[in-house]
Amino acid sequence: MKKQNLIDMEGVVTESLPNAMFRVCLDNGCEVLTHISGKIRRNYIRILPGDRVKVELTPYDLTKGRITYRLRAKSSNS
């Protein structure tokens, strides 16, 4: 169940840190320290630097967030 007061944003993973932490540069230019959500961890989804991701932020601390979705890379075949 999704919480009401979360802020959803998109960004690019710039750095992979220990303990499943990542540094993400959001589309508005802010750098955020994030961790991965339980569903991504449970399904063994790999997050690598350069991936586009969706991030949830709380209005209380805009410097930390949670990666909720890894966006698919656009294929160059079409």
Swiss-Prot record:
This protein's GO CC annotations: chloroplast; cytosol
A GO term for molecular function: ribosome binding
Compartments where located: Plastid, Chloroplast
Keyword Chloroplast attributed: yes
Gene3D superfamilies hit by this protein: Nucleic acid-binding proteins
Main location: plastid
Family matches, as NCBIfam families: infA
The protein's name: Translation initiation factor IF-1, chloroplastic
Organism of this sequence: Physcomitrium patens
Source taxonomy: Eukaryota, Viridiplantae, Streptophyta, Embryophyta, Bryophyta
Gene name of the encoded protein: infA
